[in-house]
């Protein structure tokens, strides 16, 4: 009996030391390597770019990853993910809506030849009926992979589902390969193309009346008053769509992919970081550094999370996806999310995946173009890693 007790307490002490060492390792390296003092020398004149660069260089980045082992990845992710969800406002939604039951309503259904196309609304909050298009492959049996395709900035919220407002829009959509949900259903996936919060029917009444394509600024301002963010709202919507799909559709829960372009790439990256049910994240024309993209040039207000650099860079947030699959699609001529900055961020992301023991589970695809979707990179990655 005494021997069993000694063995038990020895094992417990050993495991406690491992966790403590991992946690202390994070705290020590982050404190020593990340915290930086600001340059206190007086400057003769004001330069906005120099001022912001100084702020970015002195950002705390308390959750910037510095580990080297899978155990350190686990400890870091557990703490960072909770903090990120709190900062985005997702934790608040989880607390306030703990007993809320999502509801969905089918609006119409039609056979479009290659698929069944249905329009739905889903109540992701009591006051938020969110429109989405559901594409179902025909003549498929058993559980199927699911792809959710959040869109970016534009007037039409149904482009990804292959629904266009004009012939010119159709041409531009096909050139930019924006029919992401159509690509998915044609490859045997169940596809959901949701309206992004702040667009379409979820705009303000004033913006609808003036035909303003989106209400992102208003959404951000109102969210900030209650500790929420548009990114958090949109990630919440993705999670509620997953809840509904798993309950109502023949979905293979081991193959849930999220992929969108630009603002849809933002939602994709953050959703993969926050919701571990997502097995693969493929953001297009978004993955970069915060400082080299939204911190350097004009971007829509919905891109911003207060104090995000207190936590880390975009590569750290993407690292919360590890060891699950992650592929970023970037255009070599994208001026909004410059390739040079994306490559810099990817070096850091690769270190996280290497520490997690799965360096091949993340890829950077460089497309020969600008700010658009790159289906070749997406589907090469999917076909390589889709769990059969």
Language-model segments: residues:
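Mobile cap/lid helix-loop segments that gate and shape the active-site cleft of serine hydrolases
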Residues: 218, 224-225, 240, 278-318, ...
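N-terminal targeting or regulatory segments adjacent to alpha/beta-hydrolase or S9 domains
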Residues: 22-116, 124
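Cap/lid segment of the alpha/beta-hydrolase catalytic domain
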Residues: 142, 148-236, 247, 292-297
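Alpha/beta-hydrolase fold nucleophile elbow
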Residues: 250-261
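C-terminal catalytic histidine-bearing segment of alpha/beta-hydrolase fold enzymes
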Residues: 347-388
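Glycine-rich active-site/cofactor-binding loop and its immediate structural neighborhood
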Residues: 107-166
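Short beta-strand/loop motif that positions the catalytic acidic residue
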Residues: 321, 328-330
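Gly/Ala-rich beta-loop-alpha elbow adjacent to hydrolase catalytic centers
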Residues: 260-264, 268
